[in-house]
Curated annotation (Swiss-Prot):
Recorded superkingdom: Eukaryota
Gene: xkr6
GO CC entries: plasma membrane
A Pfam family it matches: XK-related
Name of this chain's protein: XK-related protein 6
Family to which this protein belongs: Belongs to the XK family.
Transmembrane segments: 86-106, 114-134, 253-273, 307-327, 348-368, 377-397, 410-430
Length: 578
């Protein structure tokens, strides 16, 4: 959502700048000489290892010979309002989903359909109460012992009057948060506060870093809460309303609106959460809003197809529907466990997390592993397609023709057309709009897109043997378009001297300059998390207590050092709850 630091204690704004998209020069005067520094989409880094065979080098030379047209990019102000609009739309989707469900429950009650009214209300209130309890617990962790409350005791310069005033303010905050969560508005408040902190991080020059920290943590919290509530409330609600419409052989407009709101909420939360994953990672390129919109339609169509097939099957086979869901959940959970995830601190927590992911896999694809996902995603969608075919075929064979002939053909077409449309949107996203560049590329030169003008191109050179490194070290392995490192002798001897190494052994900023830690840094005796995990969210929350202390007692930037490497990441670039 917001900007990263530039390595010198300056936050550029509410928009994403941590991948150097917004610091690109015009290139009007330097296009003929090309550039020797660019953002490489094939090796996940902002510096490439350029040899004679490098596609990046050929692309830059072609770019410098007359293709140096600067692509239009939104200004920081435009990005700010796009971010605000994204949050406002998330709030509207939230209110629409909850409001239509409550309205429908009241409508069932007036029609004396007490069973449907009770189930509809149950799937609204119970998930909301659980999420509000978790949200309030996080507030207590952040605001009590070890959190913000412990910071006051570290400063002896505060006067007694100031401490008394702070106590009154803290009491007001406690009362306000309690009332907010009692009325089930904790997520709404977090969305509003995220937008406020993002705007302040863009406008407040003196306190940008503190506003950015608070905004980043708040946005991560509200996305995690919305993801949890959506799969506890919207997914069961959608299946329930479709089953009611199919069993009663009629669809009222309020039922359709409620089902559409639940469907949109599922798709929106998944797209928003996926965008958050990339925006919060310093080693990932942020997702554009065009990519997020296509991702939204991908989820919208695939979930529609899945839920419609489940509802059709459940309208005829009540008991077998429950058996099918349990079997599918067990198979998906076993598949995830067999894949060897490494999210949680203990084995049993890991198994529990994988079981929760298995529930998500009943409705849609959800990536839980770092690395290539192509084959796993294809396998999942092949299984889902086969299941949808079997479920709809059984429904069509055992349905009551007298009551279903009016919509049977439309239902079958809807299942398979929605699935095909969702797969088409997925291919469009990965083929054209993926943040790391087109995944379905034919030309190798399409892996690189963004240029930083002003530096000379490496000269044309003949293949030569690499110069031995210090102390006779081996040649630095190159990283190809597939993301794998090549260490063969042929690669080492048939390349030019490297201009940049793929992975620097020293902490460097965006321009390749060594970063000298200005202030204290936190040592974490664990590997850096490579993909989001529920347990990592709580690890991050425990770190916040130290963060809240350091930002008050130290005027300099704090850093985080992980066990698995010497790279020093600024505190602002730490992936919150991921």
């Amino acid at each position: 959502m917001a900007a990263k630091s530039d390595g010198r204690g300056v936050v550029t704004g509410f928009a994403q700048l941590h991948n150097l998209d917004e610091v690109v020069g015009t290139g009007e005067d330097d296009a003929r000489n090309g550039s020797s520094f660019h953002i490489c989409h094939c090796c996940n880094t902002s510096s490439c290892y350029w040899g004679c065979r490098s596609a990046c080098l050929h692309y830059l030379r072609a770019k410098g010979k007359g293709e140096g047209k600067e692509t239009a990019r939104p200004t920081p102000e435009e990005r700010l309002w796009l971010d605000c609009l994204w949050i406002v739309l998330a709030l509207l989707v939230f209110f629409w989903d909850v409001g239509t469900d409550l309205w429908l429950a009241v409508d069932y009650y007036h029609k004396q359909d007490f069973l449907w009214s009770g189930l509809t209300l149950f799937f609204v209130l119970v998930p909301s109460v659980l999420v509000q309890i978790l949200s309030f617990r996080w507030f207590v962790q952040d605001y009590t012992g070890g959190g913000l409350g412990s910071v006051e005791g570290l400063s002896s310069r505060r006067a007694a009057a100031s401490l008394q005033r702070d106590k009154c303010c803290r009491l007001s905050v406690w009362i306000w948060q309690t009332v907010i969560h009692i009325f089930q508005l904790g997520q709404v408040w977090r969305y509003i506060r995220t937008m406020y902190l993002g705007i302040q991080s863009h406008r407040q020059k003196e306190n940008q870093r503190r506003f950015y920290w608070a905004m980043m943590y708040e946005y991560a919290d509200v996305n995690m809460l919305r993801l949890l509530e959506t799969f506890l409330e919207s997914a069961p609600q959608l299946v329930l309303q479709l089953c009611i419409m199919i069993q009663s052989n009629k669809a009222e407009w309020l039922q359709c609106v409620s089902a559409l709101s639940s469907l949109l909420s599922l798709a929106w939360v998944l797209a928003s959460y996926h965008k958050l994953l990339r925006d919060s990672r310093d080693d990932k390129k942020s997702m554009s809003y065009r990519g997020a919109l296509v991702h939204l339609f991908w989820r919208l169509f695939t979930i529609s197809s899945r839920v419609l097939s489940l509802a059709l099957f459940a309208s005829v086979f009540h008991i077998y529907f429950g058996i099918f869901v349990v079997l599918h959940w067990c198979a998906m959970a076993f598949w995830v466990i067999h894949g060897g995830t490494d999210f949680c601190m203990s084995k049993w927590e890991e198994v529990l997390f994988n079981m929760v992911v298995g529930v998500v896999y009943v409705f849609c694809w959800f990536n839980v592993r770092e690395g290539r996902t192509r084959y796993r995603m294809v396998a999942y969608y092949v299984v889902v397609l086969l299941e949808n075919v079997i479920l709809t075929s059984l429904w069509y064979a055992y349905r009551d023709p007298a009551t279903t002939d009016a919509y049977a053909s439309l239902a079958l077409c809807g299942v398979f057309l929605c699935f095909a449309s969702g797969v088409a949107c997925m291919v469009l996203y990965y083929g054209v709009l993926h943040p790391m560049g087109p995944r379905l590329r034919v030309l190798a030169s399409s892996c690189c897109a963004e240029l930083l003008w002003g530096l000379p191109l490496p000269p044309e050179a003949e293949p030569m043997a690499p110069t031995p490194g210090p102390r006779g070290s081996q040649a630095t392995p190159t990283r190809g378009l597939t993301g794998e490192y090549a260490e063969s002798d042929e690669t080492a001897t048939d390349t030019c001297l490297p201009v940049f190494q793929v992975r620097s052994t020293e902490p460097v900023d965006a321009a390749g300059r060594p970063i000298q830690p200005e202030g204290p840094f936190i040592k974490i005796d664990m590997p850096r998390k490579r993909y989001p995990a529920w347990d990592a969210h709580f690890v991050d929350r425990r770190l916040r207590r130290t963060v809240n202390v350091l930002q008050y007692i130290s005027p300099n930037a704090a850093g985080i050092r992980y066990r698995d490497g010497p790279l020093l990441y600024e505190l602002l670039q730490y992936e919150s709850s991921l």
